[in-house]
Design a protein with these regions (language model features):
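N-terminal functional module of multi-domain proteins
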Residues: 2-127
Length: 128
């Protein structure tokens, strides 16, 4: 019988104040790639992240407060990776860009970004 990979569940619910966002930024760096992240309100930031790694493929469900996340030259230099991230927008709105391409993602939309080039995501409200 083959064993199902463990589901990693992370939540900011047990953290208070700005520590919530710092904790979340660390989890995102460990789960995906290092990103430069910010949010309009660090004190009330909330997140639930569920991640399962199956071989080389990671599947992650993220529900979170508004935020901005960028893969910058500095974060790329710190941890060079040549991965693809497939974003499937389930709720909320996302503005994303990479190179000369930009898109506004609504529920049901998707995008593919590479981690070896700069990219930017902005979620202006709660999203999934």
């Amino acid at each position: 019988m083959q064993r199902t990979p463990a589901l990693q569940i992370t939540s900011t619910g047990s953290f208070q104040g700005p520590d919530r966002f710092s904790y979340w930024a660390d989890v995102v760096t460990q789960t995906f790639v290092p990103l430069q992240c910010d949010t309009p309100d660090r004190g009330s930031f909330c997140d639930d992240l569920r991640h399962r790694q199956i071989g080389l493929v990671g599947i992650t469900d993220v529900q979170t407060s508004p935020l901005r996340a960028a893969r910058t030259p500095a974060t790329i230099a710190r941890a060079p990776r040549d991965d693809l991230i497939v974003v499937l927008q389930i709720g909320g709105t996302c503005h994303t860009s990479q190179n000369a391409s930009a898109a506004r993602l609504l529920p049901g939309d998707g995008a593919i970004v590479t981690t070896d080039e700069c990219n930017f995501f902005e979620f202006s409200g709660d999203f999934r």
